[in-house]
């Protein structure tokens, strides 16, 4: 054992070395309970008091002093007084002429401060006081409970001047070191800070009791199952603490029938569930960590209910975790509706219907298959997605999505609405790609993808066209279709799911001209949203912007204006350009129930980049290139997200209704 005065972990314990070389610690008679450090001492006190109770009333002489004026043999006590007060309950009182504190051998203590501490603990025992046995008993308890003494024996001595009451005390040992066993998770610095100034001082049981409580509190605050189960003072002034931490033994999965609640055979592979758990076999049992694991399993989307029940394993400190799982139906058909941008006149921008089939647990491995068809008056989208939320063999939680899509969307965002001599333009796209996503830092996630797109414009009869009514080109290559191979990189930051939180999205897309006729361009976009709580109201600020450089299709330009851009304008009516910037501010306040009122203002600009788009579609249609809008609206919470109905004015004093589902982008 070294001479350093610090705390350090040795094997599974913590040791505070002695200041001087000390003999190997061996258990001393003093044992302390973790739950009540004074329990054993209290029992000893009770035994002493019972002895005093037997001796004082008959012969309160435990030891006769010798010398001049002192009797060598016990003598009878003076006449006792009856306790007439209610507190004594009729007990006899003995008049005490002197009260003293001495060591166990009857000699004065070497440390005057210890004698003073014992004397200060006395309440009833004072010179010239008539005392009962109960009052002496209470003062004995007070002396021991001061934490500095391992024993206290009251001794009555008959002297020439009367009865002398001597409290013979035995101080605790000086503190020279600490051994803490079983504390695998408790930081060593925690005990260093608790005992760094205790070297060479009397071991104070009160201080030790506070340390034990703080250790137990450390585990409780962190959701850990652990406590100090045993404490003792070894010879040489060494404290020994035994910490018991619950350890996870096994994790067992049990599937329950969603109707009867009885055990059944599950469709999900057990390893698919276990790999999502942060709680592992051999770790300390952490209630907070287990709760997070339950939430993680629920977010997989394949379970209806999840509970984890700890069960003790025999007399050990280990627990088995039994996970009860109720599976959701794996797949099925669904139908619904939504909002389309195909019709841009009137309070509603158009309705679309949808039909989908989904399987959320393919092969019992939480893989997702989605097949959907959406159809509106102009819009139509056929989409096939296959997603593996966590690739097998990967330890970074990387997901993979394979996508095939065939869509037809209105070209009104860039190329305007219907013309008397020219029907509506639609943009047809056939897209296929693969994307990989993973979290790479807390609150940050990233996506890397490769996407091929075959896109072109069509007239109202479905025939390919390369120029519109204004003779503006509709493709970059001059062919009926443009082919593009895009490499995509996206980074997303979110600090929570609350609307008052921060969100930042940064996206880069690069066209790869593998073949000469494939387009080559670079597109950069960014979006930022920040919310603030201001009393009962909420302020939401958002900004977005982007730029495209290179040879790109006109329909890939940034469209400004509309429900998710500058309200008060029709979709794409402010402008379309190679660059854009849009800012928005909203103040919302809860009115009653699920209804929320909002006041907003938007501004957007193409940053004078409209003429740089191939064919200058914005200039041909007289779009201003910049504009602002403001208005009021209401929102209603729904299972689909907030339903938004807004009434806005623009800087041309035109007014317009906007209806949307979900939060603005």
Swiss-Prot record:
Note: Probably not processed upon targeting to chloroplasts.
Family: Belongs to the OEP80 (TC 1.B.33.2) family.
Highest taxon above the source species: Eukaryota
Localization in the cell: Plastid, Chloroplast outer membrane
Organism lineage: Eukaryota, Viridiplantae, Streptophyta, Embryophyta, Tracheophyta
Keywords recorded for this protein, A-Z: Chloroplast, Membrane, Plastid, Plastid outer membrane
Occurrences of domain POTRA (ranges): 246-328
Pfam families per UniProt: Omp85, POTRA
Gene Ontology CC terms: chloroplast outer membrane; membrane
Name of encoding gene: OEP80
GO BP terms, alphabetized: chloroplast organization; embryo development ending in seed dormancy
Mitochondrion keyword on record: no
Listed name of the protein: Outer envelope protein 80, chloroplastic
């Amino acid at each position: 054992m070294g001479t350093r005065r610090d705390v350090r972990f040795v094997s599974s314990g913590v040791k505070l070395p002695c200041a001087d070389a000390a003999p190997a610690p061996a258990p001393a008679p003093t044992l302390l309970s973790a739950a009540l450090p004074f329990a054993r001492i209290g029992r000893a006190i009770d035994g002493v008091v019972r002895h005093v109770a037997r001796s004082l009333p008959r012969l309160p002489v435990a030891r006769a002093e010798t010398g001049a004026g002192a009797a060598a043999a016990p003598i009878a006590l003076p006449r006792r007084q009856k306790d007439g007060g209610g507190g004594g309950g009729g007990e006899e009182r003995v008049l005490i002429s002197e009260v003293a504190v001495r060591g166990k051998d009857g000699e004065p203590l070497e440390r005057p401060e210890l004698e003073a501490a014992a004397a200060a603990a006395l309440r009833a025992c004072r010179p010239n006081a008539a005392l009962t046995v109960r009052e002496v008993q209470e003062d004995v308890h007070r002396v021991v409970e001061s934490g500095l003494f391992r024993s206290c024996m009251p001794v009555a001595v008959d002297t020439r001047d009367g009865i002398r009451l001597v409290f013979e005390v035995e101080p605790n040992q000086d503190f020279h070191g600490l051994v803490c066993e079983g504390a695998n998770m408790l930081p060593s610095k925690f005990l260093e800070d608790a005992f760094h100034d205790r070297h060479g001082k009397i071991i104070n049981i009160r201080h030790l009791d506070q340390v034990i409580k703080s250790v137990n509190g450390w585990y409780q605050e962190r959701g850990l199952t652990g406590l100090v189960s045993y404490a003792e003072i070894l010879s040489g002034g060494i404290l020994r603490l035994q910490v018991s931490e619950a350890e996870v033994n096994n994790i067992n999965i049990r599937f329950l029938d969603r109707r009867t609640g009885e055990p059944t055979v599950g469709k999900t592979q057990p390893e698919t569930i276990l790999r999502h758990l942060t709680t592992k076999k051999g770790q300390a049992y952490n209630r907070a960590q287990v709760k997070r694991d339950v939430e993680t399993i629920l977010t997989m989307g394949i379970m209806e209910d999840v509970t984890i029940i700890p069960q003790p394993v025999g007399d050990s400190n280990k627990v088995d975790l039994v996970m009860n799982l109720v599976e959701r139906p794996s797949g099925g058909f669904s139908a619904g509706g939504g909002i389309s941008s195909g019709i841009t006149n009137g309070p509603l921008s158009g309705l679309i219907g949808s039909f989908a089939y989904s399987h959320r647990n393919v092969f019992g491995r939480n893989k997702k298959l989605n097949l959907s068809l959406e159809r509106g008056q102009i819009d139509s989208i056929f989409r096939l997605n296959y997603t593996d939320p966590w690739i097998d063999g990967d330890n970074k939680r990387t997901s993979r999505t394979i996508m095939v899509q065939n869509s037809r969307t209105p070209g009104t965002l860039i190329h305007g609405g219907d013309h008397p001599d020219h029907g509506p333009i639609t943009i047809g796209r056939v897209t296929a790609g693969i994307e990989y996503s993973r979290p790479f830092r807390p609150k940050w996630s990233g996506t890397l993808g490769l996407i091929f797109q075959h896109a072109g414009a069509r007239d109202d009869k479905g025939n390919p066209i390369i120029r519109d009514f204004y003779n503006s080109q509709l493709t970059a290559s001059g062919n009926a279709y443009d082919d593009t191979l895009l490499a995509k990189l996206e980074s997303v930051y979110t600090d929570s799911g609350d609307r008052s939180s921060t969100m930042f999205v940064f996206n880069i897309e690069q066209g790869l001209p593998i073949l000469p006729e494939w387009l080559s361009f670079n597109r950069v976009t960014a979006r930022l949203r920040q919310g603030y709580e201001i009393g009962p109201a909420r302020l939401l600020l958002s900004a977005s912007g982007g730029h495209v450089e290179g040879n790109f299709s006109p329909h890939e330009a940034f469209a400004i204006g509309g429900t998710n851009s500058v309200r008060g304008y029709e979709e794409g009516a402010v402008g379309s350009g190679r660059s854009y910037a849009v800012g928005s501010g909203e103040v919302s306040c809860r009115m009653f129930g699920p209804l929320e009122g909002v006041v907003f203002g938007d501004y957007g600009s193409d940053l004078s980049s409209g003429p740089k788009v191939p064919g200058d579609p914005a200039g041909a249609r007289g779009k201003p290139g910049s504009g602002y809008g403001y208005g009021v609206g209401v929102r209603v919470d729904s299972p689909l997200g907030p339903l938004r109905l807004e009434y806005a004015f623009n800087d041309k004093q035109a007014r317009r209704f906007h209806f949307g589902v979900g939060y603005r982008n």
